[in-house]
Regions:
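Conserved helicase ATPase core of P-loop NTP-dependent helicases/translocases
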Residues: 127-139
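Conserved catalytic network of the ASCE P-loop NTPase/AAA+ motor domain
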Residues: 62-63, 138-142, 162-166
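SF2 helicase catalytic motif II
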Residues: 151-153, 163-177
């Protein structure tokens, strides 16, 4: 509330981050591994706090992926990754539609006040039922589609994507250390 009061209803521009040297190397290595060498699977190993979620965002952008699945082991990591991706998408003026496949409806609530002012209208859907997810996936859009899910909800997204005859351009699977 303090941020909103100081802003007097005016949203401050969100800053688009630039990759740091280690992130630039990771992006370059991903391009070489997946695009140049045409590998279908790979690993990006980076320490905690080094910006893996942000690097994943930049890799997806570099690949020009339009249908992205981001799978993580916990609800907390969905929320953290969603905040990073949503913030940078707004900062870079990207047209994105979002859905979270998990059991916690509060995951879509962006908690960072600086970001929440501009992201409150993103309309982030939270679903667990494959039929609802499939219906959402079937809606065609020119926007980039990003699906966040926990591994625990993986079966729901697998069932939904099969039902919707929907395939992803890029899958990012994160681990917690």
């Amino acid at each position: 509330r303090a941020v909103r009061k100081n802003l007097k209803g005016q949203a401050q521009p969100i800053k688009a981050f630039k990759p740091r040297p280690h992130q630039k190397r990771a992006i370059k290595n991903a391009v070489e591994h997946f695009i140049t060498k045409k590998n279908e699977r790979g690993k990006m190993i980076m320490p905690c706090g080094s910006g893996k979620s942000l690097t994943g965002y930049w890799i997806a952008d570099k690949f020009k992926a339009k249908k992205i699945l981001v799978a993580v082991p916990s609800l907390a990591l969905i929320k953290q990754t969603l905040e990073v991706w949503a913030e940078q998408s707004v900062a870079n003026k990207k047209n994105v539609r979002w859905i979270c496949v998990c059991s916690d409806k509060s995951v879509g609530n962006i908690s960072n006040d600086d970001v929440a002012v501009q992201l409150q209208d993103l309309g982030i859907k939270i679903h667990t039922k494959p039929a609802e997810i499939a219906s959402w996936l079937k809606k065609r859009s020119s926007a980039t589609t990003v699906v966040f899910t926990t591994y625990q909800s993986g079966e729901a997204i697998a069932t939904a994507s099969k039902k919707a005859k929907y395939s992803f351009d890029l899958g990012i699977c994160e681990e917690e250390y």
